[in-house]
Amino acid sequence: MHRIYFEKRCILICSPDDQILSDPNMIRFSLGGSQDIHSLVDMVEVSDSLHRVCIPTSDIQGTYKAICAEFLEVNAGGGLVSNRRGDYLLISRNGMWDLPKGHQDPGEDIQVTALREVQEETGISELEVRELICITDHCYKRNGIWHLKHTWWYDMLYTDPTDLTPQTEEDITKAAWVARSSLPPYLLNTYPSIQEVFHEAKI
């Protein structure tokens, strides 16, 4: 299955026999060509009540690639950072709790991107990059052009007691360590793509 997020909404690409299709609130959509992709994106963009749309297909990867081809694709890297106490690093950006991430520079290894962006957005160093958690996809429109951002999320361990310094020029107003037991209310005020990262990390 592939998930493509539009802020708090989601397009899912799944097999025709996927259990998720039994959800009575799931809207099904059949793709016939690139025009259908644009119609679907327009529909998701303008509808406040449309939360999840599923595209059942026997060719999940081919359908995913066809959708990606209709966007300007960009890559990003980010981190789910924990410290030795087991707390997790969250940032507040534009009124939502988020994880530090940012765009890949030309020629840059994506793991290096993730490490650099965490350091820039939170002011911390002494990070140990462990394993790739998952890759999430989300769409946004900039200057009238639809972008599809693929974000590589890495598990990171912070080993130094340096204070957090939010990168205010990136609209980050706060960075905080949150105990695992205190995460639920924070995750209620974040994006589904960030919730997916925590889910894939089994947190």
Q: Where are the language model's segments positioned?
A:
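Short, hydrophobic/proline-enriched secondary-structure or compact coil segments at domain edges
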Residues: 1-9
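Conserved Nudix-box catalytic region and its N-terminal flanking loop in Nudix hydrolases
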Residues: 20-21, 26-30, 82-119, 124
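Acidic, metal-coordinating catalytic segment for phosphate/diphosphate chemistry
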Residues: 34-78
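Short hydrophobic/aromatic beta-strand or adjacent loop that forms the aromatic wall/cage
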Residues: 1, 76, 149-153
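Nudix hydrolase/Nudix homology domain
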Residues: 4, 13-29, 96, 167-203
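Unchanged
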Residues: 104-192
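Acidic surface patches and DE-rich sequence motifs
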Residues: 6, 83, 92, 141-142
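Conserved beta-strand and immediately adjacent loop positions that scaffold enzyme active sites
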Residues: 78, 87, 174
